[in-house]
Amino acid sequence: LQRQLGVPILLSGGQVYEDTGAEAKIAKRVLMSLGVPEEKILTETKSINTSQNARFSAEILRENGLSHPILVTSAFHMKRSVLNFQKQGVAVEPFPTDYLVAHHPVFHYTKLRPQTEALLDNVTVLQETLRTFVTRYIE
């Protein structure tokens, strides 16, 4: 879309962990290496969680006169992300990525064995469900 329409890209994410850089700055370097012009990349580097991503991104969108943004994030995280943008008064067009799907969706008895990956996926789902509840009803 950026190449075809020349629209800007807003990257959101600060330095979440002490031993890394700001997520938006890292992503900006990747986009530039893929040929996206630097002047078409906006960055928000203060946020450390989804609520802040939405709040600080909404400010940048308004400052730059941008409306109708396309929100790109992991599919499991999309519902809560959209809620956070709605709380900021920004209607986004969701574009989920990074779906978690089975590689071989055929039943086999070995799939009944406990697997570490499945446990981690369950933890992710539970965390996201709880965070969505908090976003919707408490924050």
Language-model features, listed with the residues they occupy:
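Short, surface-exposed alpha-helical recognition segments that flank or form part
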Residues: T45-N49, E117-T124
